[in-house]
Amino acid sequence: MSQNAGVRMNPFGNRKPVIDPRLFIGRRSLIDAVCERLTAAPPQCCALVGDARSGKTSLLYYLRSSTAARPICADATRFVFPYVNAGPYADLGASQSHGALYFWRDLARATAQALALPDDLPTLPDQGIAEAAIVDTVYALKCTVEDIIRRTGDHTFIFLIDNVEGIARLPRHTASFLRSLTQDPDIGDRVAYVVTSSTPLSRLYPVSELREPSSFWGLFASELFIGGLDDADIAALLERAPELNDADRAWIRRLGGANLTLILIAAAHVYEWRLHPTGSPDDAERAAIEEARPLCRSWWRELTETHTASVDARQSLIDQNRAPTPDEAAIFEALHARGLAQRDRHGWRIASTIFAQALSDQPDRPSTSLPPPPAAAPATPPAFTHLEGEVYAFLRENAGRVCTRDEVKRAIWPVSPPSDSALQKIIERIRDKIEPDPKHPRKLIAVRGQGYMLRRDTD
């Protein structure tokens, strides 16, 4: 918490990844599970799976912050944690080969920087270079990483790859080269990966390919799910604001359940109301629900697409007037893992008022046998990828004003931001999904020499 010109900052206002390890809250059991894998001989690869804004990136930053004075996994001097966000490379579209090039350049640079070495990297070829030359340069960058590892025999390299879905969209040699580092007889027992994904790895590639012995994805024997917070974590989080009383904390718990993002949203609005109690508490509650509604709807949509269940699953969870079917129960278990539902002797119930309200307002999905809804009906939210959704959400929060490229990058990628061209690709993909005519955008426009602006009248 800080002060600016005498105005106390909202300690729950920043819901971007936590960079300062002193502000990282809890997840002790999850960290212990990761460390158990990393301290094995040889270290084991680990996949962290969780919804958007569940704290995956913050956990990677926390691992990377390990020091001799504050070790996280046993001997801090043993581990080196190079970090790369693979998300931007997934959004390069037809430039996938160049995506592999940028990924390996960033991985080599992160490896050198983790050891405070100069990043003397091979020169990248021009955009119009032949495919074979790109592969040669990627291989040279991979060899650079190998050489760094080979020269530092007293370190174990744990590569932190955020949004590993990006790797699945790159040429297969990218994943093959990553696996080869773990198979090298000289360095393989000092290399492992901790990756994050918003979806189980089994959904990134065909099952047959995942089971291939030579597959990079076969390195991840198990996945750890980043779910709801426990009571101690929630209590520690709310201690950031001593202005809150016990009734406020109970109110926040009722609104957010045990879900990190919804607790932060609820806490931010309750905190503001406590300091400036204008209007009624209902106004603060409605504001929190309104802010979280798009995110809750996207979570529900992803769950119902992943699990086979009828639209009655939502009504069953809200009304609690019948026992759920086995398919519906699978959805409720998934909600429970996310801190959004609880089970007691009476059955399942929603643990978060925010989520319950978002579901009660969610229109049923139409049957595939019905004609499409008329044009006047409310539009279905665009099926954004994780990064597209993050960029769009930021632009929507700042609708009506120009956001510079650097401003967008700092908000979404506090560490390892993408190039301007990679950001432009993401913008173009967003336009494809929200513009009637993407070639002549009217909603998401570029302001020459400045940045991007989402018009206020955008749905």
List PLM regions with ranges.
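DNA-binding patch around the recognition helix
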Residues: 374-384, 416-417, 421-459
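Conserved NTP-binding/hydrolysis module of P-loop NTPases
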Residues: 81-120
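Winged-helix-like regulatory helical subdomains adjacent to P-loop NTPase cores
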Residues: 244-340, 344-348, 353, 379, ...
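Mid-core helix/loop region of P-loop NTP-binding domains shared across ATPases and GTPases
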Residues: 106, 110-161, 165-172, 183-190
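Walker A/P-loop-proximal flanking segment of P-loop NTPase domains
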Residues: 1-73, 147, 151, 405
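Sensor-1/coupling segment of RecA-like P-loop NTPase cores
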Residues: 166-174, 179-213
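Conserved small helical "lid"/interfacial subdomain of P-loop NTPases
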Residues: 220-248, 266
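Short amphipathic alpha-helical recognition elements used for nucleic-acid or partner binding
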Residues: 381-412, 428-430
